[in-house]
A protein has these predicted regions:
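Outer-envelope beta-barrel architecture signal
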Residues: 519-523, 533-537, 551-557, 578-584, ...
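C-terminal catalytic region of ATP-dependent kinase domains
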Residues: 145-151, 257-427, 432-439, 445, ...
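A subset of solvent-exposed loop/turn segments in beta-rich extracellular surface proteins, enriched
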Residues: 535, 545-622, 638, 642-659
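Outer-membrane beta-barrel initiation region
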Residues: 441, 451-453, 464, 470-577, ...
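Conserved ATP-binding subdomain of kinase catalytic cores across diverse folds
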Residues: 74-212, 245, 269-286, 292-302, ...
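C-terminal outer-membrane beta-barrel translocator/porin domains of Gram-negative envelope proteins
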Residues: 515-517, 566-568, 597-599, 609-615, ...
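Transmembrane beta-strands of outer-membrane beta-barrel pores
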Residues: 527-533, 543-545, 561-565, 586-594, ...
């Protein structure tokens, strides 16, 4: 059976390596008395950071030694801190507690060590729960993975920010004794008997001019008189790049407004600088970060390998907030930081760390930050160039006028005006060499779009209209695309030379700052094992582009290779509304690709005494299959497909195929086919008792292009049904039939059965029918020290047969068996099964994301 190893399967494999390569000896530090004003305490006990050489090579050393090194800090309780504080709420985004004192001043308390964006990946958001994973090796592994973060250098980062004229939050470290609080942090971790950091937080009650990021973005759309202080924001972001702080999520910012002339400028306030100076090492650990989609977490080095990649989490917000600034602002702020953060200031920043941790790692960081400082202007230029590749611009909810000037052969100019006042509120130049595409959102209001000029190599511009009564004046040219509501057709009918897309789909017209042009690449292992085919391993490479049109992506390419099956390709190109899709599938088989062949009919010999190779036929196969998919709903789809196929069976001297066909038979020559097909699939949830009822109907016609007389129509139908008997007991069944309407087909095109106790293609003919049924019992959870594990058992029964002209057979073939399934880390399901038949037994192993 086929299996595709998801990120979850990597985790299973990697955690096993963690278990067997780590030193798991447990120990506990002596309890520290609550009455001590100063205590010596480490973040982790020494046993938790004591690892073998093999573990360090595979998973890295990180900053692990710092986590078990005791430091001297004051001991506080919630009653003594700030004269007494109370818990306001859990700060889920920071895995901490928001505290308030009697003067209504706020601070954020969070344990040192713990968890980070590592567990905020899509995979861990779906599967990880601190309480469920408690006392498992995976939980210990995640805690160890956090040691890529230096636990103390946030103090130095805060000092560097203050020295650069940026916001700082007065970071401090304390010890919180046992029994000082019953609260936990957001992930369920106990907060007592730990080292904690305490930082000041802006007071929203007494400072109403402080906004959250989402509130800021809404405010900016109201009027261009509301602006971000781009100089300070760009300086903040360049400081992030200097210290390698990659965790700039929207929740990490607050915005303080101040009046300046007719405008309100919002200055950035940073909440957390804990993720600077990351140390990422270990062969398997680096690979795991890529698998989890966290490849932007990289080792802090003197020269960033990809400044765009390392700023993945902050890129969309940078695009939204810095559109008015050109490269001179970026390089100017980089120069300011370079001149301000002298060697003495950097040395002083790291001298503020707790005594006793001035080890080689701190010296390494100090050296690297000085080297990176000298390259900061180059880093700024490279990052600005990334922002300019596909800039996203917005108007306001007022009536705006957009002027796009394309007369210059080297540059494109965009200006924005407030129609009510005539004031120019935006003026930027874009290089044709560096800018590949521009998206311009009109937002609300009655906007006017003006485009003039025409040159040979024009930058594509997407004009996305809002709901107002918009007008257009455009000179002849190319590469202008207008997205307008259906109600705007009449206005655009008089506008020539542009591509027009009319749609009332809200997602097309609404501005979302997270919607930026980007792509993702991933590798997925691919494998097969059963007792018929044996092992075959390979991998898939997936390239997904997210452009303006996405449902949920713009297009996707998947290229895979498998040792037995060869190369496979799939391209998916969805429409704007996601209801239609154009797909391309292709296959180029390897020389090891084979079909089983036992002859035609329902009573063929199984050749149980012969080796498996005796009935295997090596076939070179090529297939190119474009298809059109039309979705009527999420569970109803119509597919129109056309395929061009090539087959050629290999001649051998000692196999069944050569006894069945003569040497000069057409089967051993290159055969070309065309296949036209239409299929319809539907699936419904009838009720809670019947959660799934689905069916597929397919009809088509195949023709041999070298012998047009050999053509045949065909039809297929299948039905699936799941019945939930109890919460843990389910009956599932699937029945399928195939019909060929004449005898002009080859053996690899024949109707066949899929009985789990027989080899593939064991019975083939002109017609076929088979059904399998399973009764599945969910056995619940299985306690173990590795990871949460759910398991169940199932028993199955299959029956089926084929019909072949001239054969009189009333025999129905059956197979029976069962197996067990295991669901690891709440995500990945492995299934082991063994089914028997009159031929023999067949063992199968499956690995996937469901039963």
């Amino acid at each position: 059976m086929k299996m595709r190893l998801s990120p979850a399967s990597y985790i299973v494999f990697l955690v096993m390596l963690f278990v067997f390569s780590a030193d798991m000896t447990a120990s506990v530090l002596p309890r520290v008395g609550e009455g001590d004003s100063l205590v010596r305490k480490s973040i982790y006990p020494p046993s938790a950071t004591r690892k073998s050489d093999l573990y360090n090579k595979l998973w890295g050393e990180h900053y692990r030694t710092l986590y078990s090194l005791p430091i001297t800090v004051p001991a506080v309780t919630l009653q003594s801190l700030w004269g007494g504080v109370k818990v306001v709420e859990q700060a889920a985004d920071f895995q901490g507690l928001l505290l308030e004192n009697n003067q209504q001043q706020l601070c954020l308390l969070k344990p040192l060590g713990g968890y980070t964006t590592f567990i905020e990946s899509k995979f861990f958001q779906e599967v990880y729960n601190k309480k469920v994973f408690k006392n498992t090796y995976l939980d210990q592994f995640i805690g160890d993975a956090y040691t890529i973060i230096n636990p103390y250098t946030f103090i130095s980062a805060d000092y560097l920010a203050r020295s650069s004229g940026l916001s700082s939050n007065n970071s401090r470290i304390f010890y919180l004794p046992e029994h000082s609080t019953r609260d936990t942090v957001a992930n369920g971790t106990s907060i007592e008997n730990k080292l904690v950091s305490v930082i000041d937080v802006p007071d929203f009650n007494t400072r109403p001019n402080i906004l959250l990021t989402e509130e800021l973005l809404d405010t900016l759309q109201a009027n261009k008189n509301f602006q971000v202080d781009q100089v300070l924001y760009i300086r903040e972001r360049l400081l992030d790049m200097l210290i390698g702080d990659w965790n700039k999520i929207p929740e990490n910012w607050n915005w303080l407004g101040r009046s300046e002339g007719d405008s309100i400028l919002y200055a950035p306030i940073v909440i957390d600088r804990n993720h600077a100076f990351t140390k990422v090492d270990g062969v398997l650990f680096k690979q795991m970060l890529r698998v989890l989609g966290l490849g932007f977490i990289v080792n802090y080095d003197a020269s960033p390998k990809s400044v765009r990649k390392e700023n993945t989490l902050g890129f969309a917000l940078d695009m939204a907030l810095t559109s008015q600034s050109d490269v001179s602002v970026w390089t100017g702020q980089a120069r300011f930081i370079r001149q301000t953060l002298t060697d003495s200031i950097i040395d002083k920043a790291f001298s503020r760390l707790p005594k006793g941790i001035e080890d080689k790692e701190i010296k390494r960081i100090t050296r690297i930050i000085k080297e990176r400082r000298e390259k900061l202007e180059v880093i700024a230029k490279n990052y600005f160039a990334s922002l300019q590749q596909t800039p996203v611009l917005t108007g306001t909810n007022r009536s705006d006028r957009f002027v796009i000037d394309r007369h210059n052969p080297d540059s494109l100019f965009i200006q924005m005006y407030d129609q009510q006042t005539g004031q120019r509120v935006f003026d930027r130049k874009y290089s044709r060499k560096k800018t590949k595409e521009i998206w311009l959102y009109g937002l609300e209001g009655d906007d006017r779009f003006e485009v003039s000029g025409r040159v040979n190599k024009e930058v594509p511009v997407f004009l996305i209209a809002g709901k107002g009564k918009n007008t257009y004046r455009m000179e002849p040219g190319h590469h202008i695309r207008v997205y307008e509501y259906e109600s705007g057709k009449a206005v655009l009918d008089t506008v020539p030379h542009v591509k027009k897309v009319f749609s009332d789909i809200p997602e097309i017209h609404q501005y979302d700052y997270n919607k930026i042009k980007h792509h993702k690449m991933s590798f997925t292992p691919w494998g097969i094992y059963d007792s018929d085919k044996g092992f075959s391993l390979g991998t898939f490479f997936t390239y997904t582009m997210y452009g303006f049109k996405r449902s949920p992506f713009t297009y996707q390419h998947r290229i895979g290779y498998n040792y037995i099956q060869g190369f496979v390709y799939q391209g998916i190109f969805p429409s704007y509304d996601g209801k239609k899709s154009f797909n391309i599938d292709a296959t180029i088989s390897s020389r090891r690709n084979f079909y089983n062949f036992f002859g035609f009919g329902n009573n063929t010999d199984g050749y149980k005494d012969a080796k498996k190779n005796y009935n295997r036929v090596h076939i070179r196969q090529f297939k190119l299959s474009p298809s059109f998919h039309l979705d009527f709903s999420e569970k109803e789809r119509l597919v129109l497909q056309a395929s061009w196929e090539m087959f050629k069976a290999k001649e051998t001297n000692d196999r069944f195929i050569n006894q069945f066909y003569p040497e000069d038979h057409r089967i051993f020559k290159t055969n070309l086919f065309i296949d036209l097909g239409l299929s319809f699939h539907t699936e419904k949830e009838i009720c809670s008792f019947i959660p799934k009822l689905g069916g597929t109907l397919t009809g088509g016609w195949k023709m041999n292009l070298k012998d047009a007389s050999r053509n045949f129509p065909y039809a297929e139908a299948s039905v699936e049904l799941d019945v939930k008997i109890t919460d843990r007991l389910t009956w599932a069944t699937m029945a399928k039939t195939q019909q060929l309407f004449n005898n002009k087909y080859e053996f690899y095109q024949a109707a066949s059965t899929e009985l789990r106790g027989y080899r593939d293609n064991r019975f083939i003919g002109k017609q076929s029918f088979y059904q399998y049924s399973d009764i599945r019992l969910d056995m619940g959870k299985l306690k173990n020290p590795f990871t949460p594990l759910k398991y169940g058992v199932f028993a199955g029964f299959d029956y089926g047969r084929v019909w072949f002209p001239g054969e009189q057979s009333k025999r129905w073939h059956t197979s029976y068996g069962g197996g067990i399934w295991l669901t690891l880390i709440n995500k990945i399901t492995t299934k082991y099964s063994c089914f028997g038949s009159t031929d023999s037994f067949r063992f199968m192993f499956e690995l996937g994301l469901g039963f």
